[in-house]
A protein has these predicted regions:
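ABC-type nucleotide-binding domain
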Residues: 329-609
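An intracellular "coupling" helix at the cytosolic face of ABC transporter transmembrane type-1 domains
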Residues: 13-16, 101-105, 121-130, 134, ...
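Pre-NBD coupling/linker segments of ABC/ABC-like ATPases
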Residues: 317-331
């Protein structure tokens, strides 16, 4: 019942069309049901009396009823099309807007393929149910009720047959609906799995071809495709059981009525015209019951889809703006403080990703962050922009808790280049203007120079060059530089680079850092794998297993932090081997800290890898 209320609540401006559609179908049905009464009058009154005028008049009434039914049917077709398409558009818009409000923590609960399926396949199922089921949804009950009334008017004894047939059909329909309802949910889940495999393969098609894994991916696809086919067979195999049951019931009812009616005619208790008219109502009533059963099955599947969409719409964002006018407009400066911060991605996780972090970063300073894989580097900086909320403790920016800020204002003040760089389909200009929609071409080019994008900008068509889906035609390093330029255009108080230069060479990395160092009053946090990328920072933070292991300058950590010493020694050893020509190319030999790019140990030793 709740899912039906949700469905009706999103009709919006199309409620008027829905009401008109109900009116058109109801009147059309009543007119069509009146035709058998006219036909019975012609047979029982006009034919025995030989009254041609009476028969012509009744025939004219039939034509009028048929013509009005046609007009009303056309009116319904227009209104139902608007209702179905409008409802689908409203649901898609509501779900898309809801997704935009959800925090990373909310989105972690859903696969991207599942969200896409809900916005496409599930909404198409609802549209089909409304478009194809709206007419029988109204026509079926109206035909059943009015048909039974007319049947009772013609012959009460014959109408008692329906008292036996209707309960049997209701029980059968209830059993089938109970059976297929969970199967429809399984069907949509199987569709999620199929879409997930297809989406992943299309996104990673270059890797699939590079590693010659087409056969492996085909086997994965066959598995989910077979799963979907099996679920669909089981679901629709159960759903179609209603057809033979209803047909059998219709034949039994017709034979019973003909047998009882024939005996009544022989006894002089019923006219032939009345029996003919009654048989018309039998067919109409049984067809209405079949319509109702099909509508039930359509609704069962549609309401399953509504339930899946409602799961997203009902999701409470883990992160929300402060209530009322309490939100702070912008940070006073770029200072950052972590006060006994612990964090885990899921409430039921066994261990914290970050544990009791105490750290203060002065406004305008440059801080490097190093640590092994899984040490919590990315998790730490994502708390600053409030992409996630700390599980315990508090994160402060500009001296105030990040939870006190207006979300948009905080994220405008904190520019973060994420580890996974994303560019959107469109021109270079359109992508850069994500950082500042009002930026002039001069500002765009200045940001490009700061991020060393100017070195390749002309090769990709300049600011008006088109970037294809998935940034086709742009290398990993070029994508990183474009994302850095986009972030610089925000002119944020805090700049965070989450391993954002891992795909660029050392010379370009140094140029970018030099440009960033010239930005006045900006607090800069650099997560890096290469010590060379952070050794000139004011301070370097070393993380280990979610805890702060050491804080200091390059020289201080080199003298007193064993993890930093291991990372440094590992990278220096690789650099010496590269200089000696131990299997490395010239590019690596000239890059004393390019361990990531050249395939050496990332973070110094097995313990931290």
């Amino acid at each position: 019942m709740r899912n039906l209320k949700i469905l009706f609540s999103y009709l919006g401006a199309y409620r008027r069309d829905a009401i008109l559609g109900v009116f058109f179908v109801s009147v059309e049905t009543v007119l069509e049901l009146f035709i058998p009464v006219i036909m019975a009058n012609i047979i029982d009154v006009g034919v025995p009396a030989g009254d041609i005028n009476y028969m012509l008049l009744q025939g004219a009434y039939m034509l009028v009823c048929a013509a009005l039914s046609l007009v009303l049917g056309l009116g319904y077709a227009c209104t139902s099309a608007r209702v179905a398409s409008g409802l689908g558009a409203n649901l898609r818009e509501a779900e898309y807007k809801k997704i935009q409000t959800l925090a990373f923590g909310n989105l972690d609960n859903y696969d991207a393929s599942s969200l896409v399926t809900r916005m496409t396949t599930d909404i198409t199922v609802i549209q089909n149910a409304v478009g194809n089921g709206f007419r029988p949804m109204v026509r079926g009950p109206v035909t059943l009720i009015v048909g039974l009334i007319y049947a009772l008017m013609l012959s009460r004894p014959l109408a008692t047959v329906f008292a036996i047939i209707l309960p049997v059909l209701a029980i059968v329909l209830g059993a089938i609906t109970y059976r297929v309802s969970p199967l429809y949910r399984q069907l949509q889940t199987s569709m999620d799995h199929l879409n997930g495999v297809v989406q992943e393969d299309l996104t990673a098609v270059r890797a699939v071809k590079a590693y010659v894994r087409a056969e492996h991916e085909e086997a994965k696809f066959d598995t989910v495709n077979t799963e979907l086919a099996g679920t669909a067979t089981k679901t629709f195999g159960s759903a179609v059981l209603n057809l033979p049951v209803f047909q059998l019931s219709m034949y039994v009812a017709a034979l019973s009525i003909l047998w009882i009616g024939g005996r009544m005619i022989l006894a002089g208790k019923l006219g032939v015209g009345s029996l003919t008219g009654f048989m018309s109502y039998v067919l109409l009533i049984m067809n209405s019951l079949m319509m109702i059963s099909n509508v039930f099955l359509l609704l069962t599947r549609a309401l399953t889809s509504v339930g899946r969409i409602a799961e997203v719409l009902d999701e409470e964002p883990f992160i929300a703006n402060p209530a009322g006018d309490l939100a702070i407009a912008a940070p006073a400066d770029g200072s950052i403080e972590f006060r006994d911060v612990s964090f885990k991605y899921r409430a039921d996780a066994a261990e914290d990703v970050l544990q009791h972090i105490d750290l203060r970063i002065e406004s305008g300073s440059t801080v490097g962050i190093l640590g092994g894989t899984g040490s919590g580097k990315s998790s730490l900086v994502q708390l600053i922009a409030r992409l996630y909320d700390a599980t315990e403790g508090a994160v402060l920016v500009g001296g105030r808790d990040v939870r006190d800020y207006d979300l948009a204002a905080l994220r405008d003040a904190v520019g973060i280049v994420l580890q996974k760089n994303v560019l959107f389909t469109g021109t270079v200009r359109e992508n850069l203007q994500w950082g500042n929609p009002q930026a002039s071409d001069d500002e765009l080019l200045a940001a490009c120079r700061a991020a060393c994008v100017d070195e390749f900008l002309d090769r990709i068509g300049g600011l008006d060059g088109e970037l294809g889906q998935g940034s086709a035609g742009v290398s990993g390093g070029q994508k990183q530089r474009l994302c850095i330029a986009r972030t610089l255009l925000k002119h944020p108080r805090v700049l965070i680079f989450d391993d954002s230069t891992s795909a660029v060479d050392m010379a370009t990395d140094a140029k970018i850092r030099e440009h960033i160092a010239r930005i006045p009053d900006a607090t800069v946090l650099i997560i890096a794998q290469r010590i060379a990328s952070v050794m000139d920072a004011d301070r370097i933070v070393v993380l280990d297993d979610g805890r702060v292991h050491g804080v200091g300058t390059h020289e201080e950590l080199l003298a007193g932090d064993n993890i930093y010493q291991e990372i440094y020694a590992s990278q220096m050893e690789f650099a010496r081997n590269a200089d000696a020509g131990d299997g490395s190319d010239d590019g690596c030999a000239n890059d004393p800290f390019s361990s990531v790019a050249c395939g050496s140990p990332l973070e110094g030793g097995e313990r931290h890898a």
